[in-house]
C-alpha cells in the first residue's frame, strides 16, 4: 500500500502555545526529495526535483512558476537585446536580475531554488553544512520586515539540517547564529524514552583579542 493510505491528518495542535498551521512537508534522503501536501481533496505526494519547499501556493504551482525565471543564470549575461547597441554588464551578478527579493512564499521558493541548484559546496562535511546554512540564509525572515499582526512579525526561528548517514542534527536559531549539533548515535537509540536537548539561544560571539 502507498504511504499516503497510512497517513491521517488530525486537527490537533503540536503545542497548546502554537496554532495549527497550513503546512506542506518535504521528505528527503541523500539523493531525492518528495513533497507531501494535505489539500481539501486529499493527500498529494509529488517528486521534488529541486529539493526545496515553501508554504503556499501548492507545489505544482510553485514548480510551474520556475518557467518564468528560466533565463536566470549565475553567469554574466550577454547582450541579446540588440547587437547594434553597446550594452554592458556593468556589475557582477547581473545574470540574476529579476530574481524575486520579496518575502512571499512563492518568491522565496524561486530564490532558494536558484540558490540551491547553483551553489557549490566543498568536499568536507563542515563545508557542506556551512553551505547549507548559507543557502537557506538567502530566504531568512528578519524581524520587522514581515508584519503579521500589530507589533508581531514573521521571523526565521531556526534553521536545521541532518546528516542522515551519520545521524548528526545541525541547527542555529534567530538569536544564535553559531551552528550547534546533536550526534544521535551518542544516545541509546533502542531506548523507549524521549531524549530532549534545550535549544541554545543567545548570540555567542568569539572575541579574538580577549
Which residues does each predicted region cover?
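C-terminus-biased signal that marks the final domain/tail of proteins
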Residues: 13-15, 20-21, 30-32, 52-210
Amino acid at each position: 500500500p502507498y504511504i499516503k493510505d497510512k497517513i491521517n491528518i488530525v486537527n490537533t495542535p503540536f503545542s497548546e502555545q502554537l496554532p495549527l498551521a497550513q503546512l506542506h512537508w518535504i521528505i528527503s534522503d541523500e539523493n531525492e526529495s518528495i513533497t507531501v501536501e494535505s489539500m481539501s481533496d486529499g493527500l498529494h505526494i509529488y517528486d521534488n526535483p529541486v529539493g526545496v519547499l515553501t508554504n503556499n501556493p501548492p507545489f505544482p504551482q510553485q514548480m510551474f512558476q520556475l518557467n518564468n525565471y528560466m533565463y536566470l543564470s549565475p553567469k554574466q549575461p550577454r547582450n541579446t537585446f540588440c547587437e547594434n547597441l553597446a550594452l554592458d554588464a556593468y556589475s557582477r551578478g547581473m545574470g540574476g536580475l529579476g530574481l524575486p527579493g520579496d518575502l512571499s512564499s512563492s518568491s522565496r521558493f524561486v530564490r532558494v531554488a536558484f540558490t540551491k541548484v547553483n551553489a557549490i559546496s566543498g568536499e568536507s562535511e563542515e563545508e557542506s553544512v556551512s553551505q547549507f546554512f548559507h543557502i537557506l540564509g538567502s530566504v531568512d525572515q528578519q524581524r520587522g520586515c514581515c508584519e503579521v499582526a500589530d507589533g508581531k512579525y514573521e521571523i526565521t526561528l531556526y534553521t536545521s539540517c541532518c546528516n542522515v548517514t551519520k545521524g548528526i542534527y545541525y541547527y542555529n536559531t534567530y538569536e544564535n547564529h553559531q551552528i550547534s549539533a546533536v550526534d544521535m548515535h551518542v544516545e541509546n537509540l533502542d531506548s523507549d524514552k524521549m531524549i530532549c536537548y534545550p535549544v541554545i539561544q543567545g548570540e555567542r560571539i568569539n572575541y579574538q583579542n580577549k
